[in-house]
Amino acid sequence: MSTAQKAKILQLIDSCCQNAKSTQLKSLSFVIGAVNGTTKEAKRTYIQEQCEFLEKLRQQKIREGRINILSMDAGVSNFAFSKMQLLNNDPLPKVLDWQKINLEEKFFQNLKKLSLNPAETSELVFNLTEYLFESMPIPDMFTIERQRTRTMSSRHILDPILKVNILEQILFSNLENKMKYTNKIPNTSKLRYMVCSSDPHRMTSYWCIPREETPTSSKKLKSNKHSKDSRIKLVKKILSTSILEGNSTSSTKLVEFIGVWNNRIRNALTKKKSFKLCDILEIQDNSGVRKDDDLADSFLHCLSWMEWLKNYESITELLNSKTLVKTQFGQVFEFCENKVQKLKFLQNTYNND
């Protein structure tokens, strides 16, 4: 597709937004993962920014016949990532890899704990960056969950939070600079990927029906725990649905597990009713604390970007149709509203099981 054609699609999306209602813009923002601005003008700006990013992913998928996304939840003792692939003619993405790593134990065999020493941090993140490129295919996009800068109940920045923020920043820089450096070397294969800081709030809002914010700290903490538990439960339901529905094209099936993943999940489902995600990954005790929220978040970040890209592709197809422009715009917002309702139905289905 030419530059002019790409620009035309983005221009059509902006034209679609110009006379839209605020509620319509909110639905569009939601289904493509854009920031929901407080004014109509802000909503339009954020929608355009997200569409420009998704258009790059769409073009890469058209060129290569598939798109690979690797999403990370940064942590020193509980670093988790999920890698998925979506082929041009497949309706659902496939899980290629899913891991949780204790970075200190994997890359610092002779060092007890990571300090705030720049040399140690640099070495650890360099080794991590190289590790992420060991398995093929190389991702077309890396996403890193944006980290908070302080705890909810304190104005002070604690050492663990500081470490994970430093890890996030250096990892982002290493991934960007690895591509820039490699592409300057003559006679070498060029790297083509994007690096994105992925907003945890947008991911959570997409998958978990938002709860009303409360003014008290204790209620906020309970709400936060509820959201975390809901995300873990949701991922478990996505896993079980994927296996139990087999080749079904049910609207509740969102992802494909093949090979070893299929066997591991099936084994977990037959052994006990309540299973941990760590059990599916066959994680041993030395791979950090056996908690599932890091694995769930990396999985949902990756699946979110796959969903947002698929939704964006559907919108571009509607805008590229031969119908009248006004009809196209109406179809876009109808698609967005239907998608929101389907997602709410999906969430209610999973929550009521």
Swiss-Prot record:
Describe what happens upon changing F79A. >200-fold decrease in activity
What are the entry keywords?
Endonuclease, Hydrolase, Magnesium, Metal-binding, Mitochondrion, Nuclease, Transit peptide
Please list the cofactors this protein needs. Answer: Mg(2+)
Instruction: Give me the residues that bind Mg(2+), please.
Output: D293, D294
Q: Changing D294N: reported impact? A: >200-fold decrease in activity
Q: In which organism is this protein found? A: Saccharomyces cerevisiae (strain ATCC 204508 / S288c)
Where does this protein chiefly localize? mitochondrion
What this protein is reported to do is described as:
Capable of resolving Holliday junctions. Specific for 4-way junctions. Seems to be important for the maintenance of mitochondrial DNA. Cleaves fixed junctions at the point of strand exchange. Cleaves after 5'-CT-3' sequence.
Q: Which Pfam families match?
A: Ydc2-catalyt (PF09159)
* A molecular function (GO) term: flap-structured DNA binding
Give the EC number(s) listed in the UniProt record. 3.1.21.10
Q: What is catalysed by this protein?
A: Endonucleolytic cleavage at a junction such as a reciprocal single-stranded crossover between two homologous DNA duplexes (Holliday junction)
Q: Where does the UniProt annotation locate this protein?
A: Mitochondrion
Reported effect of changing E145Q? >200-fold decrease in activity
Q: What class of enzyme is it?
A: hydrolase
Q: Note the InterPro entries from the entry.
A: Mrs1/Cce1, RNaseH-like_sf, RNaseH_sf, Ydc2_cat
Please describe the quaternary structure of this protein. Answer: Homodimer.
Entry's Gene Ontology BP terms:
mitochondrial genome maintenance
Q: Report the GO terms under cellular component.
A: mitochondrial inner membrane; mitochondrion
Transmembrane stretches in the record are: none
Give the protein name, as stated in the record.
Cruciform cutting endonuclease 1, mitochondrial
Asked if the record carries the keyword Mitochondrion, the reply is yes
Keyword check for Magnesium: yes
